[in-house]
Curated annotation (Swiss-Prot):
Family annotation (NCBIfam families): tatB
Protein name (Swiss-Prot/TrEMBL): Sec-independent protein translocase protein TatB
GO cellular component: TAT protein transport complex
Family: Belongs to the TatB family.
Database matches in HAMAP family: TatB
Record note on quaternary structure: The Tat system comprises two distinct complexes: a TatABC complex, containing multiple copies of TatA, TatB and TatC subunits, and a separate TatA complex, containing only TatA subunits. Substrates initially bind to the TatABC complex, which probably triggers association of the separate TatA complex to form the active translocon.
Cited function: Part of the twin-arginine translocation (Tat) system that transports large folded proteins containing a characteristic twin-arginine motif in their signal peptide across membranes. Together with TatC, TatB is part of a receptor directly interacting with Tat signal peptides. TatB may form an oligomeric binding site that transiently accommodates folded Tat precursor proteins before their translocation.
One Pfam family from the record: TatA_B_E
This protein's record includes keyword Transmembrane helix: yes
Length: 152
């Protein structure tokens, strides 16, 4: 409390033994202990009275409650799912299954639209671009029950 080490206390005890003598030293130590106890009790009583007057307990309780509330709010933010606006999904070309006979009939042009044969030149290499979807009536792919429902 006062920053007194054991060696300093031992030195004070030796001086007291030399000054008071062995007969009066136990009584003096008892009296000193009583005085120290009274000082501690009076100091604690004054401290409690001052704290009571300024409301330190109430302030401490409020600070503690505010700290707990802020921790609970942070926990709720972490545990609660975030409310984000769903981003629109770009439609993907729908896969279709053509009937075997309908595909050959639909793809074959009429005889009147058949172009004249071209000169023998090499055909250009096909590109990797996807072809446009065919707008022929066809049956749609069967719905997989594990996928979400399709939009109309």
């Amino acid at each position: 409390m006062f920053g007194i080490s054991f060696s300093e206390l031992l030195l004070v005890g030796l001086v007291a033994l030399l000054v008071l003598g062995p007969e009066r030293l136990p009584g003096a130590a008892r009296t000193a202990g009583l005085w120290v106890g009274r000082l501690k009790r009076s100091f604690n009583a004054i401290k409690q009275e001052v704290e009571r007057e300024i409301g330190a307990d109430e302030i401490r309780r409020q600070l503690h409650n505010e700290h707990i509330l802020s921790l609970e709010q942070e926990a709720r933010k972490i545990l609660a799912p975030t409310q984000q606006q769903p981003t629109p999904v770009e439609p993907v070309a729908e896969q279709t299954i053509h009937a075997p006979g309908a595909a050959t009939v639909a793809e074959a042009p009429p005889a009147s639209e058949v172009p004249a044969p071209l000169p023998s030149t090499p055909a250009p290499a096909p590109t990797a671009e996807p072809a446009a979807p065919v707008a022929t009536p066809a049956t749609t792919a069967p719905h997989d029950s594990t996928l979400p429902p399709r939009a109309p």
